[in-house]
């Protein structure tokens, strides 16, 4: 017992006598450990900055997800089933990075007719289509008139076939000028073939413009309010109607009528980082396959997975130099520690031999 106490006394005395060298060794060890342990954290921080920079310099609408189902019959039940399927896939795969979602429906093209004057025919025959946007009121300015109302549900066949029956719609300013119509005027859309050919009258209750034509809400579409055309082309009228009107009236007036359905999901790029990038990429590809299997002719458009692949391909070119520098510094510190330790051992060699 006394021998052990004597040994500890010698250790304490010699440590106090050589505290400068021992402190140097201890500091060197701490620095080496801290440097090596922080290298992965520093690497992740650089990776996050690189990915964030890449995402911020891309067009956000191309990063957002657009699920589209073209040329589908307009059927409320089928639409609800498709929406539930898409929502299930989104929730299962990428919900954490989604900050907003909207829907957009665009009908097939119809022949358009005036009710107060002759309508040009042949190659100059005006045309038009219906559009439905969720939360439209938050993104438009009503220049004249009032916000549209939905056609009542449960309309009878007699009511629908009434020659005076009409639905309410809104039209863009530029399109209204092309058609020379205003609030209170009517347009008639005609479509279908054979026995299913029919006409639907639209009362224009508002002339509208987008609050911001470049808003992400419009998904880079430049023909929402007016369709660009040449001077020799007939005008086309995009008419905005409510979703209730679309499903309550459209399928009965145009039994063969079809539309393209779009589900839009806006990505929060702040929630995409180097840690979850691989998971997001795989989730998008998995979701695309599942939708194509369960929703025929549908598609998923986004460049987010391509950006992640491109980012991962460039990643090693930044990681390799970083880790080479870190290991070089760590090697220098270790060399320094070994040198100082040898000096300390040489200095205390006499005491160790005596002990």
Predicted regions and their residues:
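Membrane transport/envelope proteins' first extracytoplasmic loop
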Residues: 1-331
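Interfacial "coupling" helices/loops that link adjacent transmembrane helices in transporter permeases
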Residues: 46, 335-355
């Amino acid at each position: 017992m006394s021998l052990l106490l004597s040994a500890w006394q010698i250790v304490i005395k010699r440590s106090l006598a050589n505290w400068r060298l021992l402190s140097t060794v201890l500091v060197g060890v701490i620095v080496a450990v801290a440097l090596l342990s922080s290298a992965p954290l520093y690497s992740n921080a650089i990776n996050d900055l690189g990915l964030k920079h890449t995402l911020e310099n891309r067009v956000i609408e191309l990063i957002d997800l657009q699920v589209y189902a073209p040329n589908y019959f307009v059927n409320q039940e089928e639409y609800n089933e498709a929406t539930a399927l898409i929502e299930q896939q989104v929730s299962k795969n990428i919900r954490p990075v989604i900050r907003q979602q909207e829907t957009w429906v665009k009908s097939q093209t119809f022949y358009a007719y005036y009710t107060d004057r002759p309508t040009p025919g042949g190659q100059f025959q005006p045309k038009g289509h219906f559009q439905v946007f969720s939360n439209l009121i938050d993104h438009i300015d009503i220049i004249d008139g009032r916000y549209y109302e939905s056609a009542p549900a449960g309309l009878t066949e007699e009511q629908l076939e009434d020659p005076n029956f009409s639905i309410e719609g809104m039209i863009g300013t530029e399109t209204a000028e092309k058609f020379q119509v205003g609030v209170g005027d009517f347009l008639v859309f005609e479509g279908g073939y054979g026995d299913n050919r029919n006409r639907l009258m639209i009362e224009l209750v508002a002339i509208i413009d987008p609050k911001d034509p470049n808003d992400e809400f419009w998904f880079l579409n430049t023909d929402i309010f007016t369709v660009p055309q040449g001077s020799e082309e007939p005008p086309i009228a995009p008419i905005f109607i409510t979703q209730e009107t679309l499903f309550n009236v459209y399928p009965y007036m145009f039994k063969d009528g079809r539309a393209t359905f779009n589900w839009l999901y806006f990505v929060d790029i702040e929630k995409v980082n180097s840690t979850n990038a691989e998971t997001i990429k795989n989730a998008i590809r998995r979701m695309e396959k599942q939708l194509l299997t369960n929703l025929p002719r549908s598609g998923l458009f986004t460049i987010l997975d391509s950006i992640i692949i491109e980012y991962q391909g460039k990643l090693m070119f930044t990681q390799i130099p970083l880790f080479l520098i870190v290991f070089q510094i760590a090697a220098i510190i270790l060399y320094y520690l070994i040198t100082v330790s040898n000096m300390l051992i040489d200095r205390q060699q006499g005491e160790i031999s005596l002990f």
